[in-house]
Amino acid sequence: MAWISLILSLLALSSGAISQAVVTQESALTTSPGETVTLTCRSSTGAVTTSNYANWVQQKPDHLFTGLIGGTNNRAPGVPARFSGSLIGNKAALTITGAQTEDEAIYFCALWYSNHWVFGGGTKLTVLG
């Protein structure tokens, strides 16, 4: 899947696209450099599965979007190995192992529902230090 397509879908979401499903993320999390932090993504329709192709997108303070994870656990080219995607229980998860101050950003989860993407509201990650 092309990352540009996912990012364009994110922008389209802000224009008022409507879906029956609701994707929920933590609104904010705080961690310290070197710590491991896990962000989660829950679906109102039930358990998140590999068929939802969970994607994770990072938005830095300068408003640039970077695709991190596609298809639940596939890192995009050039994304550091400290970022990993998985399914934990009934949720999709993004784990940052050994967080760095440069990881401070908003992280959006997107889930696929048959013919469209639905995005969560984003998790604002603060990295102290």
UniProtKB/Swiss-Prot annotation:
Q: Which SMART domains match?
A: IG, IGv
Could you name the Gene Ontology cellular component terms for this entry? immunoglobulin complex
Check the record and name the CDD domains matching this protein: IgV_L_lambda
Q: The Ig-like domain covers which part of the protein?
A: 20-125
Write the record's keywords in alphabetical order, separated by commas.
Answer: Adaptive immunity, Immunity, Immunoglobulin, Pyrrolidone carboxylic acid, Signal
Tell me the superkingdom of the source: Eukaryota
Coiled coil segments of this chain: none
Fetch the Pfam families from UniProt.
Answer: V-set (PF07686)
Under PROSITE patterns, the record lists:
IG_LIKE
Extract one GO BP annotation from the record.
immune response
Residues that the record marks as modified (Pyrrolidone carboxylic acid) are 20
Segment forming the signal sequence: 1-19
What's the further remark here?
Answer: Compositions and partial sequences of RPC 20 show no differences from MOPC 104E. The sequences of J558 and S104 seems identical with that shown.
The name this protein carries in UniProt is Ig lambda-1 chain V regions MOPC 104E/RPC20/J558/S104
